[in-house]
């Protein structure tokens, strides 16, 4: 049986929205609400919050200790190194990458991707629901064997490969066997629905969703969110002008497998 380790990377020093992981969602921090959702999934194995050695992230370690969660501290800016070292420290054979800025992630989506990985009979090196994306932005799940992560950790040289952990892998389809888990409904909301957090408007959106759904149903899922947005279009509009904005926009000249249709600039960048 493979030792599966899910690594959630979190730090307080966000450049666009400082301390976003400690913002309040229904009486707990955003990080806690997000990790609670990850832990609702059936197949996540050992869950580790990987924060940095920066003193300001002592608070993240304290939160993890209070909740009885695993915490690893590593490189502040080389996320590939931090991810690899965390997986190594917990004896991982299979490594799952879930970012900490997706507090609306659906545990059922996490399980769907992990079941694809665990039930594969053919060789694979990387399975995600991101390449290409079809799910609402903010349901990011990536899985790779430890030897593949080790190859990336050893060989990746570009700054964006170190910062974003997995581009070295999915940018090399000629070398690695890549598989993608699409939304079974046949929809593509990857550029139209934004459930991640980088800007104050994202926080307003996520806070509104939590306040509407969490008190009655802490295990609310993707369909619950979509039904809420249909009934309350004013919530959907809160961060709509950022829909489709992601880190790809700053690296289109470097990324071979990403097209301009898979990203957009913010209004002030256009």
List each model region and its residues.
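Conserved donor-nucleotide/metal-binding helix-loop-beta segment in metal-dependent transferases, i.e.
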Residues: 90, 106-134
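N-terminal nucleotide-binding beta1-loop-alpha1 segment
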Residues: 1-17
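A short, N-terminal amphipathic alpha-helix
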Residues: 30-47, 60, 66-67
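Short aromatic/hydrophobic "clamp" motif used to bind/position activated sugar donors
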Residues: 95-96
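Acidic donor-binding/catalytic loop of UDP-sugar-dependent glycosyltransferases
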Residues: 79-85, 99-116
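Anionic-ligand binding region
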Residues: 149-172
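Conserved donor nucleotide-binding strand/loop of the catalytic core
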Residues: 65-78
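Conserved alpha/beta core of the MobA/IspD/sugar-nucleotide pyrophosphorylase nucleotidyltransferase superfamily
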Residues: 166-269
């Amino acid at each position: 049986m493979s030792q599966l380790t899910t690594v959630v990377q979190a730090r307080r020093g966000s450049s666009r929205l400082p301390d976003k992981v400690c913002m309040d969602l229904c009486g707990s921090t955003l990080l806690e609400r997000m990790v609670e959702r990850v832990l609702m999934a059936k197949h996540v194995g050992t869950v580790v919050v990987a924060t940095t050695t920066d003193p300001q992230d002592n608070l993240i370690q304290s939160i993890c200790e209070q909740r009885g969660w695993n915490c690893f501290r590593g490189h502040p800016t080389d996320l590939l190194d931090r991810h690899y070292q965390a997986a190594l420290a917990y004896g991982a054979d299979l490594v799952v990458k879930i970012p900490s800025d997706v507090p609306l992630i659906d545990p059922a989506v996490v399980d769907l991707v992990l079941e694809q990985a665990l039930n594969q009979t053919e060789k694979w090196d990387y399975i995600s629901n991101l390449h290409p994306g079809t799910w609402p932005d903010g349901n990011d799940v990536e899985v790779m064997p430890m030897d593949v992560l080790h190859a990336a950790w050893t060989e990746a040289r570009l700054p964006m490969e170190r910062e974003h952990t997995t581009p070295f892998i999915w940018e090399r389809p000629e070398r690695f066997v890549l598989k993608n888990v699409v939304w079974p409904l046949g929809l593509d909301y990857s550029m139209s629905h934004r459930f991640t957090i980088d800007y104050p408007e994202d926080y307003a959106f996520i806070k509104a969703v939590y306040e509407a759904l969490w008190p009655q149903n802490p295990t609310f899922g993707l369909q619950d969110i979509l039904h809420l947005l249909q009934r309350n279009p004013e919530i959907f509009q809160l961060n709509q002008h950022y829909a489709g904005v992601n880190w790809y926009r700053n690296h289109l000249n470097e990324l071979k497998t990403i097209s301009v249709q898979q990203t957009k600039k913010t209004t002030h960048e256009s």
